[in-house]
Amino acid sequence: MYLSELQLNHYRNYESVDVHFSPDTNVLIGENAQGKTNLLEAIYVLALARSHRTNTDRELIQWHEDFAKITGLVQRSAGKTPLELVLSQKGKKAKVNHLEQAKLSQYIGQLNVVLFAPEDLNIVKGSPAVRRHFIDMEFGQMSSKYLYNISQYKSILKQRNQYLKQLQRRQAKDLVYLGVLSDQLAAYGAEVTVARRQFLQQMEKWAQKLHQEITKDREVLTFKYQSQIPEEQLDQSVEELYQQFQTLYEKQQIREVEQGTTLIGPHRDDVQFLVNDKDVQAFGSQGQQRTTALSVKLAEIDLMKAQTGEYPILLLDDVLSELDDLRQTHLLKTFQNKVQTFLTTTSLENVKKEIIATPRVFTVTNGVVIEEQAE
């Protein structure tokens, strides 16, 4: 899979741009605040219909404009697929092969991306919410079923929390309706929990292999899924977990009404990364945390290939300068000759020459993208 063409209209600082890319390595060079990261972000948004930098679509639309449009041509082994995403105050409209999609869940997965950014260390060092978001976004690209289930779960969770607030304030008193919401939440919560566990078990295998290569077998990386469901019971079927969630909601009903919020479910779960059986977030060195984050991110590439049959596109947003030679080498080994890559940099000096041996180079200046001619 690769992106052969990208068109932007009224996207951030881009008035109008049409860029044709190499199926191999594409390097975007420019000073800060010229639009390099915006271009990478546009590819990410085209893939996932949301930004990794903001939750507000208005920020993606050029100042004084009513909409932004991103159009791309995806080349797969099965053929070409035109994609289009329009962002406006009315919401998002997504097209595949010029046909508007009724749901974004039908659109996501047409273009798969893996993004490396300076904030990736937050996967290890950040809050549980950061790790849940990471799982949901990455797994959502590979499984439309998971994307649907997590979307339904979040929607029902919002309704249930609102109703718990009403019960807390005595603006409502119908516990039968609360039971209906609890039943629905338990059903989707069980689906999400089982899928997350399976996804993380698969990712762990890839990440372990990469981590051992980087550390030359000195360290072993393992994942531990943390839930209110006891660990020994997490390997149950969806039906068994559904029944367990139902029981927990019944037991916690008085406490949840008192607090006005849902206390049980995968929206409170976490994943713990262990290096040699020690929590790397709490006890790992900066180097161990970086290696863990890199191993987890690199594992996405092979996992997506295994799940979808196609390699994803790799987006490297100003991260190579932060990696030492060893980590750059392992990054290079992972994507060389098999993954279309986009990388941003202010200078080529900090980038290993092997990575940019035959790139297509673009200069980005104030929202204008110019391809440099090969010598």
Swiss-Prot record:
The RecF protein is involved in DNA metabolism; it is required for DNA replication and normal SOS inducibility. RecF binds preferentially to single-stranded, linear DNA. It also seems to bind ATP. This is DNA replication and repair protein RecF. One of its GO terms (biological process) is DNA replication. Belongs to the RecF family. CDD domains: ABC_RecF. GO terms for molecular function: ATP binding; single-stranded DNA binding. One of its GO terms (cellular component) is cytoplasm. Pfam families: SMC_N. It is found in: Cytoplasm. InterPro entries: DNA-binding_RecF, DNA-binding_RecF_CS, P-loop_NTPase, RecF/RecN/SMC_N, RecF_2. The gene is recF. It comes from the Bacteria. Keywords: ATP-binding, Cytoplasm, DNA damage, DNA repair, DNA replication, DNA-binding, Nucleotide-binding, SOS response. ATP binds at G30, E31, N32, A33, Q34, G35, K36, T37.
